[in-house]
């Protein structure tokens, strides 16, 4: 009879770190963010008062064993609130761009800087990461940056933000160009921006492959002039979302100096389908979708096809509404199976501004529509 003895060490057990009333950890600062391992879960339980904490996740999970940061709702479904106002950071953490976000993913000195992977942030209300609010970090009390975000993904791969409420920040969500394979799902993003500024948005993203699905986007904060969903990614999919108001509902522009994105074939293919886009009277811009670029360097523009189908667009504007603004003659839209309804007379609705090519098939537009108002 043969006896086989394995000399391999047993696989480490994933840990559940529970935070909240009557739990092992009373505060978010008690969690060892610097040493999370694949399969670990941070379970933040709802309590009546918000958690005034901010932190960085700079660790790597795996596809089978992601690192999860999960809110456990209250008795009536209330999400645990993470409030950036007067928030503190666990002293052992050391990371740059502290003023850019309440929850930050990627970019740290301690833990050691890696590209975070397979991170899930779920079921949290994250709010109030913006000027003039302050926080206490490694350099003492400081003010948030104007473009701070509720969730700031500086870099990472296979990052999911799901079921979160992101509001009252400069940007609700910010994803930098060091990110790839991003999923934003079933979130409610509203009430973000900076007063009088067009540069902060409900979400502002630039990634290699990103999907927005099942989200609700509400209006920006009063007096804020940014767009609702602004993106510079290669491999963008926007599907099954409700997107309401903003300077534009969708602002899909160029990747700027990120040549890796501009040279990728995915940069030329953008998919927007199954969404409801709503425009109320009084919004600053009469255009619903902008596609192509805004850098002024037309050679950087997308110069591809926006596949726009199975969407419902509703405009309550008393004046004109324009469905598409294409930034150059190199932009193209394949527009099919959409419904566009305006409450004004059909003659106040136009398909395009001037540039680019638009192919139409099986759409319903209010009778009297025009090709362009120009």
Where are these regions (language model features)?
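Bacterial N-terminal signal peptides
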Residues: 1-6
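Acidic Gly/Asp/Thr-rich repetitive segments characteristic of extracellular carbohydrate-active
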Residues: 12-51, 55-57, 102-104, 109
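Hydrophobic aliphatic residue packing
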Residues: 19, 42-44, 67, 189, ...
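Beta-solenoid repeat scaffold
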Residues: 33-88, 113-124
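Glycine- and acidic/polar-rich repeat regions and solenoidal domains
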Residues: 51-55, 77-117, 126-374
């Amino acid at each position: 009879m043969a006896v086989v003895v394995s000399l391999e060490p047993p696989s480490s057990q994933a840990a559940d770190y529970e935070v909240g009333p009557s739990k092992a950890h009373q505060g978010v600062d008690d969690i060892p963010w610097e040493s999370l391992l694949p399969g670990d879960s941070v379970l933040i339980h709802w309590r009546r008062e918000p958690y005034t904490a901010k932190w960085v996740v700079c660790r790597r999970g795996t596809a089978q064993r992601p690192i999860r940061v999960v809110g456990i709702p209250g008795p009536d479904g209330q999400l645990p609130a993470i409030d950036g106002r007067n928030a503190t950071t666990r002293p052992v953490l050391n990371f740059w761009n502290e003023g850019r976000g309440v929850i930050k993913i990627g970019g740290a000195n301690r833990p050691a800087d890696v590209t975070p992977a397979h991170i899930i942030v779920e079921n949290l209300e994250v709010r109030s990461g913006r000027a003039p609010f302050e926080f206490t970090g490694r350099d003492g009390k400081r003010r948030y940056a104007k473009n701070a975000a509720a969730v700031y993904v500086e870099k990472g791969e296979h990052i999911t933000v799901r079921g979160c409420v992101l509001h009252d920040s400069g940007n609700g969500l910010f994803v930098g160009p060091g990110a790839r394979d991003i999923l934003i799902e079933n979130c409610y993003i509203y009430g973000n921006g900076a007063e009088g500024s067009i540069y902060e948005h409900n979400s502002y993203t630039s990634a290699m492959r990103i999907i927005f699905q099942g989200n609700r986007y509400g209006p920006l904060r009063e007096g804020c002039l940014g767009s609702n969903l602004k993106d510079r990614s290669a491999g963008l999919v926007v599907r099954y979302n409700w997107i309401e108001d903003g300077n534009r509902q969708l602002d899909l522009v160029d990747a700027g100096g990120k040549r890796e994105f501009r040279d990728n074939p995915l940069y030329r293919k953008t998919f927007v389908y199954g969404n409801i886009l709503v425009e109320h009277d009084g919004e600053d811009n009469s255009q619903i979708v902008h596609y192509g670029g805004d850098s002024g360097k037309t050679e950087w523009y997308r110069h591809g096809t926006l596949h726009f189908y199975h969407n419902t667009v509703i405009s309550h504007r008393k004046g004109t509404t324009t469905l598409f603004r294409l930034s150059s003659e190199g932009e193209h839209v394949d527009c099919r199976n959409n419904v566009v309804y305006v409450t004004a007379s059909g003659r106040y609705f136009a398909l395009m501004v001037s540039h680019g090519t638009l192919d139409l098939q099986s759409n319903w537009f209010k009778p009297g529509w025009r090709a362009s108002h120009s």
